[in-house]
Swiss-Prot record:
GO terms for cellular component: cytosolic large ribosomal subunit. The lineage of its organism: Bacteria, Pseudomonadati, Pseudomonadota, Betaproteobacteria, Burkholderiales. Residues 1-21 are annotated as: Disordered. It comes from the Bacteria. GO terms for molecular function: structural constituent of ribosome. GO terms for biological process: translation. The gene is rpmA. It comes from Paraburkholderia phytofirmans (strain DSM 17436 / LMG 22146 / PsJN). The keyword Ribonucleoprotein applies. This is Large ribosomal subunit protein bL27. Belongs to the bacterial ribosomal protein bL27 family.
């Protein structure tokens, strides 16, 4: 009688879903008010002029304009600003 022993079962095969974090609009690019600039965990980047921050630390534009990244202070904090579009 031909028999085949049961194969072992793998204990692998699990992973968390990616959160799609990071910079969504880069320096010099145009953005509309309410547009998401950066999705992040914690304040890796800080809001500057015309930029708001959500409860999940998402940075978003408060006005229409162009995105500008800079550093500030001795700690070299990464700041995100929106330069308003010329009207």
């Amino acid at each position: 009688m031909a028999h085949k022993k049961a194969g072992g079962s793998s204990r692998n095969g699990r992973d968390s879903e990616s959160k799609r974090l990071g910079v969504k609009v880069y320096g010099g690019q145009a953005i509309n008010a309410g547009g998401i600039i950066v999705r992040q965990r914690g304040t890796r980047m800080h809001p500057g002029e015309n930029v708001g921050i959500g409860k999940d630390h998402t940075l978003f534009a408060l006005t229409d304009g162009h995105v500008n990244f800079s550093t500030k202070g001795a700690a070299k904090k990464h700041m995100v600003n929106v330069v308003p579009a010329a009207v």
